[in-house]
Amino acid sequence: MADFLPSRSVLSVCFPGCVLTNGEAEQQRKSKEIDKCLSREKTYVKRLVKILLLGAGESGKSTFLKQMRIIHGQDFDQRAREEFRPTIYSNVIKGMRVLVDAREKLHIPWGDNKNQLHGDKLMAFDTRAPMAAQGMVETRVFLQYLPAIRALWEDSGIQNAYDRRREFQLGESVKYFLDNLDKLGVPDYIPSQQDILLARRPTKGIHEYDFEIKNVPFKMVDVGGQRSERKRWFECFDSVTSILFLVSSSEFDQVLMEDRQTNRLTESLNIFETIVNNRVFSNVSIILFLNKTDLLEEKVQVVSIKDYFLEFEGDPHCLRDVQKFLVECFRGKRRDQQQRPLYHHFTTAINTENIRLVFRDVKDTILHDNLKQLMLQ
């Protein structure tokens, strides 16, 4: 006698909910998979270390983010390096135009009067052209201007203008690129890692970089530091684990590009005061990066910080005295001195090894301070 096998319809009547159609089974499988994904996402979000890079414009935030990519992620491949070439060419042309203009305004004579023609050529460069307006210059165009740029950089008038650069706005990497014109002038020039770190383009909008360290997910967020970009900062404040506040420590004698009046260090102090006393960040680790130590070390030899900050006491030409003063200035901006300790580091963002060592300490500080929240115990 053949075994009696009840039909699907009989089973569904006797045991409702136990028999699924193929479509229902697939739907249930997808639902379970979605639940697993949501659970993993929830765990990821709880363990995520979200680090916000804040600071005034040109403090080194974007350079620091590039270093994170080099140290903890994929290095810049050839295609990524090539993408920086138009930016570097733009940095050079823009920098030389600034120097030519400064030489004239400062009434510095040409070393060779024939270079007036080269200067005129640079000043006639169309900055409103589509690519130039975006901070990029094609190789073909750059090579047309290269002989004039080289002749100008060798002129004593331009060199004298450069020596007085704190009297006007000049990018800090301009000298590096002008000293390497032979390399930049090769038609198939590929930017090196150091070239990329020194390439300057203002940050517009929000840039994020994700990486992992020992199975701990990190998200680093860079937001433009110019005044026009700071309104975007509030978009990034949610679920912040730590803030790295970068300061260009060498700019105590310079003014903002935005208004050409406000002292840059004073601007950084004002921004920091707003951030460090914001209740939103009462449980957030705030770490101060006094950046551009290499430039500060050079500057204190020839410029007295006391001329700009009368309250300074100590030797204005002693790096340690100046650094101690800077730390005290930022510590003094905290209204509640009993809140979390303010960690600080002296950094040089273009130095990969320096940033590697500093971030190792920063990472340990962040993980230690947020152990419970990150569920790492």
UniProtKB/Swiss-Prot annotation:
Expressed in brain and testis, as well as in kidney and sperm (at protein level). The keyword Iron does not apply. InterPro entries: Gprotein_alpha_12/13, Gprotein_alpha_su, GproteinA_insert, P-loop_NTPase. Mg(2+) binds at S62, T203. Disulfide bonds: none annotated. PROSITE patterns: G_ALPHA. Residues 287-294 are annotated as: G4 motif. Disruption phenotype: Confers increased susceptibility to lymphomagenesis of germinal center origin with bone marrow involvement. One of its GO terms (biological process) is regulation of postsynapse assembly. A lipid is attached at C14, C18 (S-palmitoyl cysteine). Transmembrane segments: none annotated. One of its GO terms (cellular component) is plasma membrane. Keywords: Cytoplasm, GTP-binding, Lipoprotein, Magnesium, Membrane, Metal-binding, Nucleotide-binding, Nucleus, Palmitate, Phosphoprotein, Transducer. Residues 195-203 are annotated as: G2 motif. It holds the Pfam family G-alpha. The modification Phosphothreonine is found at T203. GO terms for molecular function: G protein activity; G protein-coupled receptor binding; G-protein beta/gamma-subunit complex binding; GTP binding; GTPase activity; metal ion binding. Guanine nucleotide-binding proteins (G proteins) are involved as modulators or transducers in various transmembrane signaling systems. Activates effector molecule RhoA by binding and activating RhoGEFs (ARHGEF1/p115RhoGEF, ARHGEF11/PDZ-RhoGEF and ARHGEF12/LARG). GNA13-dependent Rho signaling subsequently regulates transcription factor AP-1 (activating protein-1). Promotes tumor cell invasion and metastasis by activating Rho/ROCK signaling pathway. Inhibits CDH1-mediated cell adhesion in a process independent from Rho activation. Belongs to the G-alpha family. G(12) subfamily. This is Guanine nucleotide-binding protein subunit alpha-13. The lineage of its organism: Eukaryota, Metazoa, Chordata, Craniata, Vertebrata. The gene is Gna13.
